[in-house]
């Protein structure tokens, strides 16, 4: 009896074209997604770095702006101080010129020389009278710091903050009124003296007349300038190194009293 024949065969499964494309797509998609993730991380780092850089630039610009502003203010103060010294120098030069003219005229005219001496004596006498009046007044704890005379006026600085009415009473104690500023030159001179504080002066709002008035009800060459300042009715005026300013009369500032030496011979 013969043995049966055994037949072997190999079975090959052919993938469809669609399945092959899907496999190829999956094989290529993996590296692409990995590349995209790497690029995304890089961009995030770049954006963060740019954000930090912009923030630092903003801070730098802000600091520079503050420095420039402070530098401008400092230059303005220096300019104002130089202008004041220039004005004071001009005023002193004018005074010296007038004095020199009178002195020169005294060579040819004795009356001119006598007039000059009389003016000097009268101013010195007024200075002495003011000093005597102030020294003879009893100290009431008003914090008087210093006083001085300039040109035709003597000024008394009371370094104790008070209301406008309080400063008025303190000045009256020394037989003086709150200071009246007569012109622009006197204003600039006093502004240089009050650095860096603020002081009440003899200017307040008269509710009956409904206008700003000096304490002696007199006139000043500053009246036109004061009207242009548009002060609010009902207040009082104080002086600082930069300006005249109106405020509530019950606020506290230092005081300036003043006396005019107006007893000159005719």
UniProtKB/Swiss-Prot annotation:
Location(s), subcellular: Membrane
Cellular component, GO annotation: plasma membrane
Chain's role: Receptor on natural killer (NK) cells for class I MHC.
This protein's name: Killer cell lectin-like receptor 6
A GO biological-process term: cell adhesion
Keyword vocabulary terms for this entry: Cell adhesion, Disulfide bond, Glycoprotein, Lectin, Membrane, Receptor, Signal-anchor, Transmembrane, Transmembrane helix
Residue pairs linked by disulfide bridges in the UniProt entry: 149-154, 167-255, 171-257, 236-249
Pfam families (UniProt xref): Lectin_C, Ly49
Source taxonomy: Eukaryota, Metazoa, Chordata, Craniata, Vertebrata
Organism: Mus musculus (Mouse)
Gene3D superfamilies, A to Z: Mannose-Binding Protein A, subunit A
Membrane-spanning ranges: 45-66
Gene name tied to this protein: Klra6
Extracellular domain ranges by topology: 67-266
């Amino acid at each position: 009896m013969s043995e049966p024949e055994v037949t072997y065969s190999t079975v090959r499964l052919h993938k469809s074209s669609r399945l092959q494309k899907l496999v190829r797509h999956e094989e290529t998609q993996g590296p692409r997604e990995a590349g995209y993730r790497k690029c995304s991380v890089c961009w995030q780092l770049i954006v963060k770095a740019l954000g930090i850089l912009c923030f630092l630039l903003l801070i730098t610009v802000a600091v520079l702006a503050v420095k420039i502003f402070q530098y401008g203010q400092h230059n303005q103060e220096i300019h104002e101080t130089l202008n004041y010294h220039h004005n004071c120098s001009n005023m002193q030069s004018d005074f010296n010129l007038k004095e020199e003219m009178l002195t020169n005229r005294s060579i040819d005219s004795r009356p001119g020389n006598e007039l000059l001496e009389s003016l000097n004596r009268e101013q010195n006498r007024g200075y002495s009278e003011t000093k005597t009046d102030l020294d003879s007044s009893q100290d009431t704890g008003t914090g008087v710091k210093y006083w001085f005379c300039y040109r035709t006026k003597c000024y008394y600085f009371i370094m104790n903050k008070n209301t406008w009415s309080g400063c008025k009473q303190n000045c009256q104690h020394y037989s003086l009124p709150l200071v009246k500023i007569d012109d622009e030159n006197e204003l600039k001179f006093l502004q240089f003296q009050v650095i860096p504080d603020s002081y009440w002066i003899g200017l307040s709002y008269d509710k009956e007349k409904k206008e700003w008035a000096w304490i002696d009800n007199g006139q000043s060459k500053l009246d036109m300038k004061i009207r242009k300042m548009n002060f609010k009715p009902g207040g009082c005026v104080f002086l600082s190194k930069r300006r005249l300013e109106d405020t509530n009369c019950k606020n506290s500032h230092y005081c300036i009293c003043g006396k005019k030496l107006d007893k000159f011979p005719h």
